[in-house]
Regions:
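Short, positively charged and aromatic/hydrophobic N-terminal segments
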Residues: 11-14, 37-38, 44, 49-50
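Positively charged, low-complexity intrinsically disordered leader regions
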Residues: 55-82
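Acidic, Ser/Thr-rich peripheral helices and adjacent loops at domain boundaries
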Residues: 126-142, 249-269
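A conserved mid-domain beta-alpha-beta active-site/ligand-binding segment of alpha/beta enzyme cores
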Residues: 253-318
Length: 383
């Protein structure tokens, strides 16, 4: 999104500048460099003051410098040998990482999937547990629980002849969840972790007008932040969906801008609707909806609809009856940030650091909000 806005500004301003430059040049004086009038000088100075490099020849040649030609998300993951993509918010959040996983698998990367599970994991086969609080869910993992997104995904992956183990964690506090992640990192020799949020509440710092449903997202963020892993990222898919839970998305954009200034924003990356990754993702979501018809994922349903070009109040489940959805192309865009820089900006991460259980996390977040002297005022989009 930031790249699109910047491009529009440059095109419009350049067009206006060229009109003025053309008017001030006579045919016999076009060989030398054009004279820029005071209006153009003011524009370029203003852009430069905001950190943009206006002279292409002055751009640094450091190979680590981000380039429009290579999405920073993939550039950051390129050196990794073993990548763990984990659903930060629980339930079907891991599905939001599938388009990324498909692209990485296609490129030959070793990718593992994990999920903070809302299923009754205590009922699954004992042999599925590979460590305390870590279950390796396979297509044939037995459980009487009808709501089991991890097994549903494992079965779908197996049908596509893709790696079909989905690691699952029960809802926990920060300390045991960190231990579970640490086991996976060591067991799988992971050198890159990507937390994926279906929605945007993982990007909130705590002083916004509303935090949405942050418990699982922020627990995952705190758990992974303390791990020694070379690459740690957070990516959000489903911009706008959390408005249902009160999230103000102008404040989300404000947070992304602040992360950009800190060097922690890796940009936005759209999932092309006609791509193989989008087609597979839609199929996986449809399969999950068929497996859990009484509780399909509203989040993944909206994202899948967005990747197919749907717009507005799209109906795909009885669960959305009576609501007013606004499916749009922004929901099919990955917004990616550096995990450590995101964690450093969270105002209440230290409040939940020593938690053991999920209930403790809920209580600590509520206490933080109760003590907050003033929240940021929500704003409407000006356009």
């Amino acid at each position: 999104m930031a790249a699109v806005v910047f491009t529009v500004v440059v095109i419009v301003a350049s067009s206006g500048c060229m009109d003025r430059l053309g008017a001030g040049l006579s045919p016999g004086r076009r060989r030398g460099p054009p004279r820029i009038d005071k209006h153009a000088q003011t524009f370029f100075r203003g852009v430069a003051d905001h950190g943009a490099v206006m002279n292409p020849t002055a751009q640094p040649s450091d190979p680590g410098t981000p380039s429009l030609a290579v999405p920073p998300l993939f550039a950051a993951l390129a050196p990794a040998r073993s990548i763990l993509i984990a659903g930060a918010g629980g339930g079907f959040d891991v599905y939001a990482g599938l388009p990324l996983a498909f692209a990485l698998w296609r490129g030959g990367a070793q990718v593992h999937l994990a999920s903070l599970s809302f299923s009754e994991l205590e009922l699954i086969d004992r042999e599925a547990w590979v460590a305390e609080h870590v279950a390796a869910v396979q297509p044939d993992t037995a459980s009487p629980d009808w709501y089991f997104p991890e097994r549903t995904l494992a079965r779908w992956l197996a049908a596509q002849q893709l790696p079909s183990t989905v690691y699952a964690f029960p809802p926990l506090g920060v300390q045991p969840l960190r231990a579970a992640y640490r086991h996976l990192v060591e067991h799988l020799d992971v050198d890159a972790v990507v937390l994926v949020d279906g929605g945007t509440d993982v990007l909130l710092r705590g002083d916004e007008s509303d935090l949405g449903t942050p418990v699982e997202d922020i627990t995952s963020l705190a758990a992974v932040a303390a791990l020694e892993v070379p690459v740690k990222l957070v990516t959000s898919l489903g911009f706008g969906i959390d408005a249902y839970d009160g999230v103000n998305h102008v404040q989300v954009l404000e947070n992304l801008a602040a992360l950009d200034r800190d060097g922690g924003y890796l940009g936005a990356l759209s999932i092309p609707g006609s791509s193989r990754e989008a087609a597979l993702y839609r199929d996986a979501v449809a399969d999950a909806q068929a497996a859990t018809p009484d509780r399909p994922s509203i989040v993944q349903g909206q994202i899948a609809a967005a990747t197919s070009g749907a717009f507005g109040d799209v109906r795909f489940s009885r669960r959305t009856r009576g609501g007013d959805l606004f499916v749009n192309p922004l929901m099919a865009i990955y917004f990616t940030v550096d995990l450590d820089k995101l964690a450093a900006r969270c105002l209440y991460l230290d409040h939940i650091e020593n938690t053991i259980g999920r209930r403790q996390v809920i209580t600590r977040i509520q206490a933080f909000r109760d003590e907050l002297l003033s929240a940021r005022v929500p704003r409407a989009f000006p356009h």
